[in-house]
Amino acid sequence: MNRLPFGYIKLRLAGRKANPMTNLIHHWSGGSMNFTWESLVLIVAGVILLRISGRKSIAQMTSTQTVVMISIGTIIVQPIIEYSLFKTLIAAAIFTSTLIVMEWIQMKSNTIEKMLTGKAKIVIENGQLHIENLKKMRLTADQLEMQLRLHGVTAIQDVKIATLEANGQLGIELTDDAKPLTVRDLKKLIHPDFINKDGQAQSGNQNIFDEVGKKNKKNVPKKLH
């Protein structure tokens, strides 16, 4: 049997009518697209993916969440240049799924949570700076004072304990003398009999700042650690 020349086969294949499904796959995987329609699809996809992954602001994100969100934003923009929408949506979905899985694992394991997210560090205790922790966190005294001012604190001596949280925010507990007057305090002044009852109730309350130093988590469900 005589074999057909290779060039003849190429010409026959080029002349065939393309399969509609092949055209659709080629269109979604890298073909030319309308710029306006492409941009709208990417915006909607980005909003949906970020909505699924969480509603935290950038200031409240941990380092892992920030890296993933920046990566998603970078990936979503790529089709504008590379014209590959289908692969982009898959990659962004993978990033989002990875973030959700990582957060689920952190809820199940304290060790992995500390490794990926970190834990709160005490930076001020009884009006004194924790120099070593400040060095580890690469936080200067000026930056710490700025955070204190944003919380309305005018003197470090008024701070009983201050912690730098995993998301970069500062948690502050003031000394008893520096705390603002509350309804509980007014009841103590107006109703002397309330002091004993309130004292008993207050002694049973757990201070969430104790969890940082003493690792006390008695009231936290096991599912949330």
Swiss-Prot record:
Compositionally biased tracts (Polar residues): 199-208
Gene3D superfamilies: bsu07140 like domains
InterPro entries (UniProt xref): DUF421, UPF0702_alpha/beta_dom_sf
Segments of this protein annotated with the region Disordered: 197-225
TM regions (residue ranges): 30-50, 66-86, 87-107
Subcellular location: Cell membrane
Main location: membrane
Keyword tags: Cell membrane, Membrane, Transmembrane, Transmembrane helix
PANTHER family: UPF0702 TRANSMEMBRANE PROTEIN YCAP, UPF0702 TRANSMEMBRANE PROTEIN YDFR
Family indicated by similarity: Belongs to the UPF0702 family.
Protein name (Swiss-Prot/TrEMBL): UPF0702 transmembrane protein YdfR
Source species taxonomy: Bacteria, Bacillati, Bacillota, Bacilli, Bacillales
